[in-house]
């Protein structure tokens, strides 16, 4: 059995870039693992949102990659974008710390909404290393094979694009730096924004560094102000 590419619900440019991944044996194993997980309980995000990051940020539009670990595992939180939650859901602690850093870095008022779709639509790929999770079980799908897929995403961006900003927060994300050609891109590393890191994330100023780099390379900077999105 193989994967039918026509049935993979992912944006066309990504489907072309990642075609070899979708047709590989490990991706078929991911599919079977997901089918079995769905038989035994709830899986987040909903299947139509698993590739949300790719559908909101086509390959040719990627300017920035923010790498997370796995989706939120509570009902109604995961939406297929790292660190993001839907409108109306309480802002999680790590995202609240990201907002505080943006305020300190750029003077932007902290929004009361956790939906990061506005960033994604500007070219910020909000990628989780693992794209699914079982209900109330953090990292429960970490052995499904998703990391092979997300590593391939990072490698393809690194090899086929130039001038991308990679934000790698925490030890897990920082370990992915070896997948990136640092002479072609900007790799920014810091502690994780989680409160468990005891504030070590603060002062990294990644958001201004990112925009300065994009401008230097002739690209439009990211508008990090989510208030411009939530007011629309």
UniProtKB/Swiss-Prot annotation:
The keyword Hydrolase applies. PROSITE patterns: U_DNA_GLYCOSYLASE (PS00130). It is an enzyme of class 3 (hydrolase). GO terms for molecular function: uracil DNA N-glycosylase activity. InterPro entries: UDG_fam1 (IPR002043), Ura-DNA_Glyclase_AS (IPR018085), Uracil-DNA_glycosylase-like (IPR005122), Uracil-DNA_glycosylase-like_sf (IPR036895). Its EC number is 3.2.2.27. Keywords: Cytoplasm, DNA damage, DNA repair, Hydrolase. The active site is at 70 (proton acceptor). One of its GO terms (biological process) is base-excision repair, AP site formation via deaminated base removal. It catalyses: Hydrolyzes single-stranded DNA or mismatched double-stranded DNA and polynucleotides, releasing free uracil. It comes from the Bacteria. It is found in: Cytoplasm. Pfam families: UDG. The keyword Hydrolase applies. GO terms for cellular component: cytoplasm. Signal peptide: none annotated. Belongs to the uracil-DNA glycosylase (UDG) superfamily. UNG family. Excises uracil residues from the DNA which can arise as a result of misincorporation of dUMP residues by DNA polymerase or due to deamination of cytosine. NCBIfam families: PRK05254.1-1 (NF003588), PRK05254.1-2 (NF003589), PRK05254.1-4 (NF003591), PRK05254.1-5 (NF003592), ung (TIGR00628). HAMAP family: UDG. This is Uracil-DNA glycosylase. It comes from Campylobacter fetus subsp. fetus (strain 82-40). The gene is ung.
